[in-house]
């Protein structure tokens, strides 16, 4: 009898708690709108994270979701001439292929339109701004994101976001921490509107050296620590070597490490070729990733796919895949299937093969 009474009391207490919770949720929804709070379950599932390809199949695989996540802040950093802007322009081109509106905030005043066009960027549809101050640049970014009509905003670069106080001051004046404070405020303002609008914001950043570091890496990025915390993905891009055709250097071997990833396991590393005037070499990746996935076989210096030999030496195999786009698409689809990614779009691939 006592057990039954205790059971009834627990039921009543649970019912009271549920009633109080329902009342609190109703009050929140009245005050802040429907959908401002919900249960993370089957009835109100959070949509899967939408991704935009980076233009590099290997990097898409390393990121775990097939590309860079929409509705998030991304940081791409590395030394000079490492391929930061090239990689970002490939992301812009891929987003435009999906019908998205892209904006490029060129704080460095260094964007080469012809190079962007070679990488597949539609210049007629690309919004570009060359702001005078860091405050102006970040205000433009905030307005574009809040509009809900822009899919991707690129800021090139954080180091060039000079605060107004520094521009108006004399050369040599010390403005301690002004850029870090500016970035910290911008991150706080941008985060909520980026999530609501599902707009991806990519910040390109440069590397600086910390003075007096005895242990650990002396490298750091500009603009303080706020961007490091707010970024969902941080990519460290480096030049790993040169690609030569006889004595002429035709491109760079590039290494990218995913140093932070909130949407998949981090610390994955990938290498791909960036060819001068062409961008990321897709056929080179197909050969390297094909060998790892067991799709392409390498015997000595010969490469083969199925029963067909596709070339002696890596450069000859790359040329064979350029000349046979159907085979390249078949290899790509098998690589994607082995990693659980969606199949590539044939039309986009033809365009890339032609560029390579």
Curated annotation (Swiss-Prot):
Cellular compartment(s): Cytoplasm
Main localization, broad class: cytoplasm
GO cellular component: cytosol
Origin superkingdom: Bacteria
Binding site for ATP: 78-85
Gene3D superfamilies: P-loop containing nucleotide triphosphate hydrolases (3.40.50.300)
GO molecular function per UniProt: ATP binding; ATP hydrolysis activity; ATP-dependent DNA damage sensor activity; damaged DNA binding; single-stranded DNA binding
An annotated GO BP: SOS response
Listed Pfam families: RecA, RecA_C
Keywords from the named record: ATP-binding, Cytoplasm, DNA damage, DNA recombination, DNA repair, DNA-binding, Nucleotide-binding, SOS response
Similarity remark: Belongs to the RecA family.
Function of the molecule: Can catalyze the hydrolysis of ATP in the presence of single-stranded DNA, the ATP-dependent uptake of single-stranded DNA by duplex DNA, and the ATP-dependent hybridization of homologous single-stranded DNAs. It interacts with LexA causing its activation and leading to its autocatalytic cleavage.
Protein name, UniProt field: Protein RecA
Organism name: Paracoccus denitrificans
């Amino acid at each position: 009898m006592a057990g039954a009474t205790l059971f009834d009391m627990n039921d009543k207490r649970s019912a009271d708690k549920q009633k109080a919770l329902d009342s609190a949720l109703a009050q929140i929804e009245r005050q802040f709108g429907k959908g401002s709070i919900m249960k993370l379950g089957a009835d109100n599932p959070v949509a899967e994270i939408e991704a935009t390809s980076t233009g590099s199949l290997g990097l898409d695989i390393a990121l775990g979701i097939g590309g860079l996540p929409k509705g998030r802040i991304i940081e791409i950093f590395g030394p000079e001439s490492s391929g930061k802007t090239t990689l970002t322009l490939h992301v812009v081109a891929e987003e435009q292929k999906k019908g998205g509106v892209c904006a490029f905030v060129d704080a460095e005043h260094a964007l080469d339109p012809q190079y962007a066009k070679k990488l597949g960027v539609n210049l007629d549809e690309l919004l570009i701004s060359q702001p005078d101050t860091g405050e102006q640049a970040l205000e433009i970014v905030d307005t574009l994101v809040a509009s809900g009509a822009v899919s991707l905003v690129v800021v090139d670069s954080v180091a060039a976001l000079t605060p107004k106080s520094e521009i108006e001051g004399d050369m040599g004046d010390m403005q301690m921490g002004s850029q870090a404070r500016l970035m910290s405020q911008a991150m706080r303002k941008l985060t909520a509107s980026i999530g609501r609008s599902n707009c991806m914001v990519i910040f390109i950043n440069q590397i600086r050296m910390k003075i007096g570091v005895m242990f650990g890496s002396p490298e750091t990025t500009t603009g303080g620590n706020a961007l490091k915390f707010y970024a969902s993905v941080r990519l460290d891009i480096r030049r790993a070597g040169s690609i030569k055709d006889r004595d002429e250097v035709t491109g760079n071997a590039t290494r990218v490490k995913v140093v932070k990833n909130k949407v998949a396991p981090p610390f994955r590393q990938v290498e791909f070729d960036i060819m001068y005037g062409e961008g990321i070499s897709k056929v080179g990746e197909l050969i390297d990733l094909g060998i790892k996935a067991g799709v392409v076989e390498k015997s000595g210096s010969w490469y083969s796919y199925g029963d067909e030999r596709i070339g002696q030496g890596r450069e000859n195999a790359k040329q064979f895949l350029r000349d046979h786009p159907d085979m390249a698409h078949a290899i790509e689809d098998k690589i994607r299937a082995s990693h659980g990614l969606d199949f590539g779009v044939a039309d986009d691939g033809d365009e890339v093969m032609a560029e390579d």
